[in-house]
Amino acid sequence: DVYKRQDQTIFTALKQVLQELNFEYCPIDVELTESCLIENDELALSVIQQFSQLGAQVHLDDFGTGYSSLSQLARFPIDAIKLDQVFVRDIHKQPVSQSLVRAIVAVAQALNLQVIAEGVESAKEDAFLTKNGINERQGFLFAKPMPAVAFERWYKRYLKRA
């Protein structure tokens, strides 16, 4: 929403909050879609640079389903690509998806980008992704969306297991 409105106040407010809390780094990951990069590349570059200057990580969301262009990966200073769930779903049974994921991981590694898999729902999907170098995964296999209070309880239990 900030991106679409070209609202610069978010950067000032975020910087102020980080200073007030004495954070040494910004614990926020910002996600932009591929279409954001296409719609207004100058604005996208400015937004990415401003968030990066605050220490936020910038992720390219739903990678591979929009206007994918490898040139975007080289042009925009992002930190991670989020592999869309269409590649993840039943990947252990889909040879084409397996090949595409391996290729995407290879490109990301060559560009020093992190890869995050979205939509992981089964242990078999998780095993394939882990085996192929994707160390961050999201999806119902790990937790479903939940209210903040429920998340706090879940997180405390998670820390006890870790």
Where do the protein language model's features map onto the residues?
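Short, small-residue-biased leader/transition segments that mark boundaries at the very start
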Residues: 2-3
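The catalytic core of metal-dependent phosphodiesterases that act on cyclic dinucleotides
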Residues: 15-91, 107, 111-145
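Cytochrome P450 core scaffold surrounding the K-helix E-X-X-R motif
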Residues: 7-8, 86
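Residue-level marker of structural boundaries
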Residues: 78, 96-97, 156, 160
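Charged helix-capping and loop-helix junction motifs
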Residues: 10-16, 43-46, 95-102
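C-terminal helical cap(s) of enzyme catalytic domains, especially alpha/beta-barrels
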Residues: 130, 146-162
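Switch/connector loops and helix/strand junctions flanking conserved nucleotide-binding motifs
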Residues: 6-7, 39
